[in-house]
Amino acid sequence: MAIERTFSILKPDATARNLTGAINALIEKAGLRIVAQKRIRMTREQAETFYAVHKARPFFGELVDFMISGPVVVQVLEGEGAILKYRDIMGATDPSKAADGTIRKLHAKSVGENSVHGSDATETAAVEIAQFFSGNEIVG
């Protein structure tokens, strides 16, 4: 399996509960390296652009409001099969359906406040990484 990069966001519900270290430990335990990380407060424009794929969905406004409600931690993760590996350790979007030991089973509050985001494909990972990081911020 190839070394690849994926994008991660630790959402406001996770940062509000100081879970960055606990989530990072799960990421690293799974064999992924955190090659870039920063804590930011997303602007409304950033959140609307990031979640533009959901613009027509009824939850779009609520999602954007949630993502700008507090700090987030944006990350670039690297490793063999990083995209699928991170999606596996995140767990199902609905924490009640997430497997034991996954980030969402351990830390998510609800479907809406599900602690983390991870890219779903190579192409989306590249776009999402570029939205928040310049090349010199990624130290692989």
UniProtKB/Swiss-Prot annotation:
Sequence intervals crossing the membrane: none
Domain of life of the organism encoding this protein: Bacteria
Cofactor: Mg(2+)
GO MF assignments: ATP binding; metal ion binding; nucleoside diphosphate kinase activity
EC number: 2.7.4.6
Location relative to the cell: Cytoplasm
CDD domains reported for this sequence: NDPk_I (cd04413)
UniProt: ATP binding residues: K11, F59, R87, T93, R104, N114
Gene Ontology cellular component list: cytoplasm
Keywords of the record: ATP-binding, Cytoplasm, Kinase, Magnesium, Metal-binding, Nucleotide metabolism, Nucleotide-binding, Phosphoprotein, Transferase
Entry annotated with the keyword Ligase: no
Active site feature: H117
Matching PROSITE patterns: NDPK_LIKE
Catalytic activity: a 2'-deoxyribonucleoside 5'-diphosphate + ATP = a 2'-deoxyribonucleoside 5'-triphosphate + ADP; a ribonucleoside 5'-diphosphate + ATP = a ribonucleoside 5'-triphosphate + ADP
Single GO biological process annotation from the record: CTP biosynthetic process
InterPro entries: NDK-like_dom, NDK-like_dom_sf, Nucleoside_diP_kinase
Protein family according to the UniProt entry: Belongs to the NDK family.
Function, as annotated: Major role in the synthesis of nucleoside triphosphates other than ATP. The ATP gamma phosphate is transferred to the NDP beta phosphate via a ping-pong mechanism, using a phosphorylated active-site intermediate.
Complex formation: Homotetramer.
Name the record gives this protein: Nucleoside diphosphate kinase
Source organism (scientific name): Nitrobacter winogradskyi (strain ATCC 25391 / DSM 10237 / CIP 104748 / NCIMB 11846 / Nb-255)
Phylogenetic lineage: Bacteria, Pseudomonadati, Pseudomonadota, Alphaproteobacteria, Hyphomicrobiales
